[in-house]
C-alpha cells in the first residue's frame, strides 16, 4: 500500500502566529488604557486620574499613535499571509510615520504642562520626564530596526520593543491597578513593562533556547526609559530643566 506523505510542516507558522497574537494583545492593552480618555471618551466612566479636554494637537497625536498600532497589526498579518514584498513596502511608510511621531510626541509632552494632565504625586514640569524619555528610546530602537531590516529575527523584535514603549507606559500605566502614588505608579510601570516583554522572553526560550539579543536590548532600553525619568521625578531635579524647554506651557 502506498504511503501518502504528510505535507511538510511550516516551521515559520508558529512564529507568524505568535507575532500576530502579540500585536493583538498590545492593541487590546492600548484600547483599555486609552478608552476613557480617547477612544470611548464621554461614553465610559473616566479613570481616577486627570482627564482634561483634548485640543487638536493631542487629538492628532492620538490618531497618529492609533495609526502606528494599526500598522503593527497590518504588518504582522502581511507576514502571516506571506505577503512579504507588501510588508517591506509598507515598512518604508511606517518609518516615515515613526519619524513624524517624534516631534508630535515632544509637543504633546511639553504642552501637557499647561493642560495639567500629570498625576497627583508630582507636578507638570517633572512629569514631562516620563513622555520625553520615550523619544530617544523609541528613536534608537526604530533606527536599529531599520538598520537590521534584512535580519528578520532582529527586526521584528526591535519593532515590537519600540511599540511596547508606547504600550507599557502611556497605555498600561493608565489602567487603575495601583494606588495613584509615586511608588504605586513605579511598580505598575516596571511590572507592566516586564509583562509586555514576558511573552517574547518565553518565545525566545522556546524557539532559541535563550533570550535573543534584540529582545534583551528592547527590554533594557524600556526599563531604562522608566527608571531614569522616575528617578528624576523622585528627586524633583527635572523641573528646572523642563521649564527651559521650547514650548513648555504653550
Q: PLM features: what roles do these ranges have?
A:
Residues 64-76:
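Central hydrophobic cores of alpha-helical transmembrane segments in multi-pass inner-membrane proteins
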Residues 78-109:
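Hydrophobic/aromatic-rich structural module bridging two neighboring secondary-structure elements via a short loop
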Amino acid at each position: 500500500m502506498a504511503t501518502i506523505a504528510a505535507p511538510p510542516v511550516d516551521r515559520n507558522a508558529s512564529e507568524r502566529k505568535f507575532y500576530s497574537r502579540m500585536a493583538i494583545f498590545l492593541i487590546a492593552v492600548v484600547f483599555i488604557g486609552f478608552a476613557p480618555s480617547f477612544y470611548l471618551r464621554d461614553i465610559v466612566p473616566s479613570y481616577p486620574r486627570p482627564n482634561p479636554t483634548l485640543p487638536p494637537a493631542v487629538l492628532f497625536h492620538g490618531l497618529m499613535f492609533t495609526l502606528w498600532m494599526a500598522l503593527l497589526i497590518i504588518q504582522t498579518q502581511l507576514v502571516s499571509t506571506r505577503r512579504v514584498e507588501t510588508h517591506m513596502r509598507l515598512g518604508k511608510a511606517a518609518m516615515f510615520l515613526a519619524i513624524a511621531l517624534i516631534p508630535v510626541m515632544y509637543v504633546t509632552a511639553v504642552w501637557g504642562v499647561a493642560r495639567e494632565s500629570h498625576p497627583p504625586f508630582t507636578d507638570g514640569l517633572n512629569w514631562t520626564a516620563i513622555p520625553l524619555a520615550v523619544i530617544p528610546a523609541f528613536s534608537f530602537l526604530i533606527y536599529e530596526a531599520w538598520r537590521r531590516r534584512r535580519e528578520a529575527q532582529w527586526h521584528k523584535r526591535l519593532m515590537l520593543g519600540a511599540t511596547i514603549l508606547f504600550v507599557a507606559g502611556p497605555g498600561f500605566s493608565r489602567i487603575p491597578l495601583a494606588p495613584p502614588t509615586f511608588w504605586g505608579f513605579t511598580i505598575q510601570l516596571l511590572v507592566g513593562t516586564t509583562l509586555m516583554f514576558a511573552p517574547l522572553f518565553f518565545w525566545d526560550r522556546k524557539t532559541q533556547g535563550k533570550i535573543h539579543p534584540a529582545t534583551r536590548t528592547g527590554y533594557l532600553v524600556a526599563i531604562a526609559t522608566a527608571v531614569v525619568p522616575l528617578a528624576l521625578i523622585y528627586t524633583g531635579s527635572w523641573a528646572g530643566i523642563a521649564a527651559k524647554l521650547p514650548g513648555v506651557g504653550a
